[in-house]
UniProtKB/Swiss-Prot annotation:
HAMAP family: MatK. The gene is matK. One of its GO terms (cellular component) is chloroplast. Usually encoded in the trnK tRNA gene intron. Probably assists in splicing its own and other chloroplast group II introns. It comes from Portulaca oleracea. It is found in: Plastid, Chloroplast. Keywords: Chloroplast, mRNA processing, Plastid, RNA-binding, tRNA processing. This is Maturase K. InterPro entries: Domain_X (IPR024937), Maturase_MatK (IPR002866), Maturase_MatK_N (IPR024942). PANTHER family: MATURASE K (PTHR34811:SF1). GO terms for biological process: mRNA processing; RNA splicing; tRNA processing. GO terms for molecular function: RNA binding. It comes from the Eukaryota.
């Protein structure tokens, strides 16, 4: 990244947020090629594997040539038409990957520079980057909250919304025109060979570019939403005129004109949004908004979000995509866990003179449970078991060495144990470990043309214990087993703050 930053510093176009000149810089595509971009995409000739740095630039030039892009089935047979269309799909995939690299790297450099500036003022903590840091936050906050909004963030229904979001950051019109032209042409290209119901701009073939655009769109929405939430704690002391001036830039003019007619009711409406105990977390396309307020307040936030998306981002979200759930009666489905607040009863006997009586003290406890059914479904999809959870052999691995088979199963099992170590109840995790352990034994037995019973009897069951390491065994290397601190760690959930994303823990091939 340092050597790449040196190239961009030499290019004065990026200093003014101009992307278009970067499209024609060869080191951009060389950087993408060297860092694991799908290498077969940027090959001039797949036969001799000769790499060409000019292919994407040529395709961009061709994309502006209407005679090359506009296809007609006149004077051509059916096979030639579809062959040409599939070839055109490949061209758009190449441009998509190249454009994704171009827009990712400068924004990454902006992030790095901002972090370097903040390091001088704040203490750097890598633990806060972990997605598991959300759950200690839940443990600390959920016990004092009442309601939660489970929000499914809507996808943009129009491609122009994605382009308009970038408009505030990208200064050159040429890049925006190229991106807009590419998105519309790619959609039209797919519509000719793909049924309309199956068209998705977030397809796997172009996932990198569209995920970047979607994440950037969500971050833009969150920055405005957090700003408005921060202002809500001061709404009592702000007059309508001052408040209108502060949010004027973030709202549409016609929407604000409509609001102005309700001036005399605005103070009352805004008072209901005053909530100092409001917390917001998100991962991917799902977010959770928790509050200590009442059910009426949560309904206000629900319809506020719907109007906020519609008026500011032109997104239509149906009310059923936002669920209002009391934390005392409902479990939150988030990041592979069912999280809930459970009441534990603690009975204490009290003695006063000659009379004794029992005092029942309910104590709230944060509880996390592994979602066993989706996890078994993922294992079944990866051919480790059937849909009922019965272990089967992994036939595609029978050609590997025994050590490689054991290592693959062990790595998957350790990843699952590492990620789900914070579960309050380990029974579901033990079931997953049993499926993987028996699947490994069946795979080895199938390779050696033997039965599982005979194979385990010949080698012994101890050969599997090396890689199915329990979390307690890891902790025993850090803390003495007989210490009181260690005993509390063994009983309670353990969150590892070195997990930065949810990997495909099952299909770890």
């Amino acid at each position: 990244m340092e050597e790449f930053q040196r190239y961009i510093e030499l290019d004065r176009s990026w200093q003014h947020n101009f992307f278009y000149p970067l499209i024609f810089q060869e080191y951009i595509y060389g950087f993408a090629y060297d860092h694991g971009l799908n290498k077969s995409i940027l090959l001039e000739n797949a036969g001799d594997k000769k790499y060409s740095l000019l292919i994407v630039k040529r395709l961009i030039t061709r994309m502006y040539q209407q005679n090359h892009l506009i296809l007609s089935d006149k004077n051509s047979n059916q096979n030639d038409f579809f062959g040409h269309k599939h070839k055109k799909n490949l061209y758009y995939q190449m441009i998509s990957e190249g454009f994704a690299v171009i827009v990712e790297i400068p924004f990454s450099l902006l992030l790095i520079s901002s972090l370097e500036a903040k390091e001088k003022k704040i203490v750097k903590s890598n633990n806060l980057r972990s997605i598991h840091s959300i759950f200690p936050f839940f443990e600390d906050k959920f016990l004092h909250l009442n309601y939660a909004l489970e929000i499914l963030i809507p996808y943009p229904i129009h491609l122009e919304i994605l382009v308009q979001t970038l408009r505030y950051w990208v200064k050159d019109a040429s890049s925006l025109h190229l991106l807009r032209f590419f998105l519309y042409e790619y959609r039209n290209c797919n519509s000719l060979i793909t049924p309309p119901k199956s068209i998705s701009i977030f397809s796997k073939s172009n996932q990198r570019l569209f995920l970047f655009l979607y994440n950037f769109h969500v971050c833009e929405y969150e920055s405005l939403f957090v700003f408005l939430c921060n202002q809500s704690s001061h709404l009592r002391s702000i007059s309508f005129g001052a408040l209108l001036e502060r949010i004027y830039f973030y709202g549409k003019l016609e929407y604000l004109v409509k609001v102005k007619t309700f001036t005399k009711y605005l103070r009352v409406i805004l008072w209901f949004f005053k909530d100092p105990f409001l917390h917001y977390v998100r991962y991917r396309g799902k977010s959770i908004l928790t509050s200590k307020g009442t059910s009426f307040l949560m309904h206000k936030w629900k319809y506020y979000l719907i109007n906020f998306w519609q008026s500011r981002f032109s997104l239509w979200s149906q009310p059923r995509r936002i669920y209002i759930n009391p934390l005392s009666k409902h479990s939150l489905d988030f990041m592979g866990f069912f999280s809930s607040v459970r009441l534990n009863s603690s009975v204490v006997r009290s003695q006063m003179v000659e009379n004794s009586f029992l005092i029942d003290n309910p104590i709230k406890k944060f509880d996390t449970i592994v979602r066993i059914i989706p996890l078994v479904g993922s294992l079944a999809k990866a051919k480790f078991c059937n849909v009922l959870g019965h272990p089967i052999s992994k036939s595609v691995w029978t050609d590997l060495l025994d050590s490689d088979i054991i290592d693959r199963f062990g790595r998957i099992c350790r990843n699952l144990s590492h990620y789900y170590s914070g579960s309050s109840r380990k029974k579901s995790l033990y079931q997953i470990k049993y499926i993987l352990r028996l699947s490994c034994a069946r795979t080895l037995a199938r390779k050696h043309k033997s039965t599982v019973r005979a194979f385990l009897k010949r080698l012994g069951s101890e050969f599997l214990e090396e890689f199915f390491t329990e979390e307690e065994r890891i902790l025993s290397l850090i803390l003495p087993r007989d210490s009181s601190i260690s005993r509390r760690f063994y009983r309670g959930p353990i969150w590892y703050l070195d997990i930065f994303c949810i990997h495909d823990l099952v299909n770890d091939e």
